[in-house]
Amino acid sequence: MALDWVGNLVSIHCGPTLGVYQGEISSVDQTSQTISLRNPFHNGVKCTVPEVTFSAMDIKDLKILEISKNSIEVSKQNGPESSSTTLMPHVGRKDKGGGGGGGGAPANSAPVMVPNKAEPRLQEGGVSPVPHYSKSYGERHIDMAVQGKGFRRRHNSWSSSCRGPNQATPKKNGLKNGGHMKNKDDECFGDGMDDVLDEDFDFEGNLALFDKAAVLSQIESSERRGNGARSRGTPGEQTPSRYRHDENILEAKPVVYRQITVPQNGSKEYSTDSGLVVPSISFELHKRLLAAAESHGLSLERRLEMTGVCASQMALTLLGGPNRLTPKNVHQRPTVALLCGPHVQGAQGISCGRHLANHEVEVVLFLPNFVKMLEAITSELALFGKTGGRLVSNVKDLPETPVDLVINCLDSHENGFLRDQPWYKAAADWANQNRAPVLSIDPPVSGQAHAVEAKWSLSLGLPLPLSEGAGRVYPCDIGIPRQVFQEVGIKYHSPFGCKFVIPLHSE
């Protein structure tokens, strides 16, 4: 009876101290109640000794992983007329109260079911038809080592690709034919990745280990702890070890959105993209501010230069910026029409046209002929003439086709009678009939409707209370120091940040 167990693959559980051993049964001694395994694996790792022996007192549980072919044939010979299944003996611990017959199986041992004649026999390749769904890595290596007639699959080889899936060439068993050397070759040169690649990943089992509800509740509790920076709290409170990406370690002061206050609130207030409130100022306060800045050294020439730079930067952005002004688009240079009057606002427009012409923009400057011009206009015209831009004094010489942008500098803050001049009306009509968008530089505050409907308006410093016809307001920083604002009664903190021109939103 003991010989029936030889050749079977078993897994022996010896408790938490000794662990689990797996291997092929080499001998069973009923007298001394011992069992020996060859090619053993201890906890999935192959042992260094070729054989280990276990006493029945150390065995907690014994499982049969694979029944050898000889055991099945013996069972069929002993009971051919039996029922569909035959019970195989089970080696376990000796019962404490047992008398004679030391080879008996314990009462609580589970019988092993052996298939009858109707079930399929072993295949020619020596692979057992019994499914092995829960074998460990070490158990599968035992299967590969003890299958005498099995074959080992090789990836990327011609022989395995030419044969069909069931046309395996059986190995020759025995020491004569080099079976022992073949096993050594497999241990030395074999890649253990074949069995790993055949194993399917258990998605459902791993998903069951993830407690999704607990993780979501932890995230929600961390989000409910507070919005913004954490406070220090009382000494008894535990400071959290981790902060969110939008939290500050140091306490932040509350944001003050009204950082600019004026002595007389204008009729309009604006706000920046970050929420800062920018109040408008009257034209009288605007004049006092420019006069105070000029007395401290911010001359008219400096102001014209700063206004021209800021206006040209905004115009270049409106024209397309780096997407339009590239060396590959030399054949598609943008065209800008400048409409200027004989005043300081016109000089600001000429300065803007000079900077645009320096950036490879085709500029057409309209300026009516006057016997006497302001000195600022004369100096700006001299510089503009060196850029290659075109200067016209008649509206008929302006482009007939739509241009890319129209810059309006026709209006003056103080000379409102210019609107009645023929050249002014003709230039305003041309701008309204042209399909190009209009940018107004430093438009005035007047009760009348704007002669030229603008899409954008550029203001110097703090904006004026402009009407809806001025379009969207963009203030520009012309370099007025903070103490100059304080001299005229304005509490000022720069809303520009890292830019010189920012958009404003009407409140």
From Swiss-Prot:
What residue stretches are annotated with the DFDF domain?
Answer: 189-225
Region annotated Required for interaction with DDX6, chain positions: 188-295
Keyword Cytoplasm set for record: yes
InterPro entries cross-referenced by the UniProt entry: DFDF (IPR025762), FDF_dom (IPR019050), Lsm14-like_N (IPR025609), Lsm16_N (IPR034107), Sm (IPR047575), YjeF_N_dom (IPR004443), YjeF_N_dom_sf (IPR036652)
Q: Please state where this protein is localized.
A: Cytoplasm, P-body
**Function text:** Binds single-stranded RNA. Involved in the process of mRNA degradation and in the positive regulation of mRNA decapping.
| Name of the protein described by the UniProt record | Enhancer of mRNA-decapping protein 3
Protein's organism: Danio rerio (Zebrafish)
Q: What is the lineage of its organism?
A: Eukaryota, Metazoa, Chordata, Craniata, Vertebrata
